[in-house]
Amino acid sequence: MAIMKINANMLQKAFLAGANRIESKKEYINQLNVFPVPDGDTGTNMTLTIMSAAKEVAALEQPTMATLSKAISSGSLRGARGNSGVILSQLFRGFCREIANKEELTTDDLAACFEQAVATAYKAVMKPKEGTILTVASGMAEKAREIHRKVKDIEEFGRIVIDYGNEVLAYTPELLPVLK
């Protein structure tokens, strides 16, 4: 059955599932960490950041988009660790700006959320470099913008955007001169 809209309860569950997924992939993400410093802590920092937000999100008994927005934004900012955590918190901040005044989200809304997330994160980084988490987020936002009018099922939309993010991730080493 196609899901054409998601409400705050559904988004809360999706966010918590995503947080748990990042936590379960922490070591894999640590291995991806090669720039700016190959210190192997990107997964750890992203996990600490998102789990801080997840704690606040999980505490919401009757979530609305506004309360989710606040919990995700403030929780991720308070829990942000390292460059990757700060960037992740800014991606969430931009995304949450778009959802705060909504009742439900469609693929059109999600595409706008991804665009705002990327714009906010790029502005937060003094010298953004391609071949990083920013590149992956930007690619995902571009794919969302490309397909949102054709793909209305949120699950299919999410799969396509995530699959494209993985393609961009695989290509990122080609974009960093220090890795060539």
Residue positions per predicted region:
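N-terminal loops that bind phosphate or other acidic moieties
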Residues: 1-180
